[in-house]
Structure formats: C-alpha cells, structure tokens
Amino acid sequence: MTIKRTKDINHDTFRKAWRNYRLAPVAIAVSAVFMLSACEKSDETVSLYMNADECSQANPSQSEQCTTAYNNALKEAEKTAPKYATKEDCIAEFGEAQCTQTPAQAGLGTTTSSTSTNGEAQAQQQQSGSFWMPLMAGYMMGRLMGGGSAPSQPLFSSKSATSPANGQFVDSTGKSYGPATAGGRSMTVPKTAMAPKPATTTTITRGGFGDSVAKQSTMQRSASSGSTSRSVGG
C-alpha cells in the first residue's frame, strides 16, 4: 500500500501559527510589565514627621510648605479624630496628657454609649457641646511640590500600655504606619492613605479605637502575607 503525500499543505499557515506561538510569551511578559507599572503608580512616597520643625529641618528650602501641611493636618484632625464623650474614656485609650477638649461639630451624634461609669461627667460634656479627642502626634505628608502645598494627613499615637496603638503612628481609621519616632522618615504607602478621611459623626466607646487598630493590623498582615505568597508562587 502506497501512502500519497498531499500537495495541498498550506505551509504559510503553519509558519504563521508557529510565529504566533513564539510571540505569545513575549506578549504576556509585556502585559506583566504594564501591570507592574500600574501597581507602582498606585503607591506614593510620603514623609512622617512629629511637627513642622522636623519637616523644616529635613527640607530647609521648603519650610513654609512644611508649616502649611502641618496646619492642614491639624484642621483635618479636628474633623476626623476619634471623639469621646468624657476625658476619662479618651485617656484610657491614649494615655495621660494625650487628650484635648474640642467643640462638638455639627451633626456629631452623642448616642453612642461609653463604658465609663461616670455618667454624670458624660452628661456634662454632652450638655456643654464639647467632646474629647487625642492630640495629633504627627503628620504624614506627600511629596513637596515647588510653589504648591503638599497633601497631609494627621497621625495619632497612644501612650496607654494596653492599646494596640501604643508607640505607633496611626491614622483616624486605625491603620498603622510604624513606630512613632522623632526625626522624620519616609515610606511608601497606597495613594488611598492620603485621601481625605470621613468626618467623625459619633462618639466611640472606650477601647473602640483600639479595636479598629487591631483589626487594621490584622488586615495589613493578611495583605502582606498574601502578597508574599503570590510573589513566591508566581
């Protein structure tokens, strides 16, 4: 039996398919580069300072912007910092000499109960139209732009040994940005870290902010662990 070879094989089609196969890995690699670039653009480098003087020392030619960013962070802290009905509740969370009294903002509710047994003090604070909030321990500042103002966000820290925020820089949502140390330092954060935070509209119970810090820390560890696993496996 004789096997006949066909003369109708389209060699160009085979060569084209082979070229496409060889180009596929290249296309995937290029796509990966673009995806990595997109991820990089979603992060930005920020600086953490305790006060405007630290910023000015690190950026002598931009002292005015340092002060402006600091003052803007103070204003933001008044709106977004956790609020407490009593001084005792605030001190329990943040420590002695770490709290200040602030006028109640429009729309700030007072229905959230406190675990403090000093109900009379709570009623007096609510009647006086003021609440207690932690002092701003530092601020996070975006990149300084020539002639413009840098974005900033307030940071808080606790001196209470029982608080998850003890010795840490945390924002108003409870997210931690590492040790609250002097001298200034830089780090890379998601751009969402510099986005405006929602204004505080209710008082919180004693220990409530600490719970938020603990939850945020757990989420950060999980995200970091997941990222590492993908990098190793990928």
Curated annotation (Swiss-Prot):
InterPro entries: Biofilm_formation_YgiB. Residues 150-175 have a biased composition (Polar residues). Residues 105-129, 149-234 are annotated as: Disordered. Residues 110-127, 188-205, 216-234 have a biased composition (Low complexity). Signal peptide: none annotated. It comes from the Bacteria. HAMAP family: UPF0441. Belongs to the UPF0441 family. This is UPF0441 protein plu3956. It comes from Photorhabdus laumondii subsp. laumondii (strain DSM 15139 / CIP 105565 / TT01) (Photorhabdus luminescens subsp. laumondii). The lineage of its organism: Bacteria, Pseudomonadati, Pseudomonadota, Gammaproteobacteria, Enterobacterales.
